């Protein structure tokens, strides 16, 4: 509430595992959310996360219904959730349930904590996943955790003009003009500062 009064934007980063009532109450104070959709497979959620997929999908639907700007991150782990058919199912669900303009961040896995035995995600695998999600109809698909990759750039879906160039977590160039492409005036969805 204090942030709202001070005109400060509130963003939630979450695994999406939250009950409906507290989520709806929280949404009134949020402007945006980024949810980690770990995989589009209940078996993965059960074996790797000790959870289930359905509550995460329901949380995503609720956030969209509540009017939040929503972005999704999928950490691609070699051999566990990098199956292209699963990526296509996930992207299709996102397009159908949340909208084609919902950004999807395909992120590189780095061996850490309990998964030190697995290799980092190859760049080629990330780019294949990105193409699969784009082919399923998502307009804004990015590759993350690979600074310098061209797939970090936001392109106008109408004319392909580079709107926002990033390097890792740094915005290097922002060509948006009042939330629109400067060439064709296409409105670019998002929460702009």
Residues covered by each model-derived region:
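Conserved AdoMet/S-adenosylmethionine-binding subsite of the radical SAM
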Residues: 1-121, 129
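Auxiliary Fe-S-binding modules of radical SAM enzymes
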Residues: 79-193
